[in-house]
Amino acid sequence: MTAVTDRQKLQYIAARAADARVNVELETEGMTLNIGPQHPATHGTLRIVARLDGEQVIAAEPIAGYMHRGYEKIAEVRTYAQVTTLVNRIDWLGSFANEVPFILAAERLMEVEAPPRATWIRTLLFEMSRIANLILFLGDMGVQLGAITPVFFAFRDREYVLDQIERVTGGRFHPNFDRIGGLKDDLPKGWLEDTKRVMDKVRTFCDEIEDLLMGSEVFQERTRGIGVIPPDVAVQYGLSGANARASGIDWDLRRDACVGLAYPEVDWKVWTHPDGDSFARFWVRLQEVREATRIIDQLADGVPSGPVMAKVPRIIKVPAGEAWISTENPLGEMGYYVVSQGDLTPFRLKIRSASFNNVSITPWLLRGVYVPDIVTILASLYFILGDIDR
């Protein structure tokens, strides 16, 4: 009898509430969430200060500078050969690619051209640096979303690429191999054949990643439609590289503004995606790793014979002048503006790196997203803090 009475009471209360159309509005108190500066999703010492309304981001502010090293100022008291040891440490995952545009700018001022063999080897090592960089992105993207297996595959196959780079340059992460007028050394015997075998392993890795991540329903749900960047916004924020191409912008400096490298001599494709979301950014970089293996195979088959160093003075004094060179680096456009007054050292060095723009868009991109999607978006933008804190 008691149970029936209780049920009747509940029905009566519910009816009264419905009749009175009682609306209960819940108010939430905003909070501030600090992501970083020590956080695996920020690839270094980046801090994101996010203001939340419940689980939703209402504002986000990126704060960099915790690792600033002052490379542009230090370069003013270093010789041109010594500057390459600095720029190696900007994007430390693709070090050789950082050297090339600086050396090309110095060569333009000196009116020196590297021999064809050196140009082809430069391009080959440039693409190997791209693979070494992007392989880690492909594995790390899975880790940020809770899938740890892909990163083990990434480290496994990245070692093969780094071993080949080390055989030529002597350095795995900081080669310091490029020189004004060419390269420090020639290729060791059998290196090209071994490199082509490594490219077969990299292609297998790409297939594994595609199966593990892109074939996962969870990965698709966590990335599709998340962090969409329209083409006009990408242009406004100066995005470049894969981030721009993932928003449908068909622009690649290797094809559209190639200087001093052998890309026009080989057959390759620029990949774009129309969606502009986190999935598109992952997909474009996966295709770029595959395309890099094609480029390397063609370069390995066609490297011309001859010297790897032009005749330049032992002590380099770059003539007075100004030069700007930018290249399509793994993270996007990397450019150097070199000003010389005819001394042993640059008078001024301005570095344009891609990661600063990649991070600059986060206040616009994170507004309105939910907390779990913050890490997805940061991982898909892909930046290295050494590329920002120079």
Model segments located where?
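Active-site bordering "gate/hinge" segments
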Residues: 2-47, 51-348, 352-390
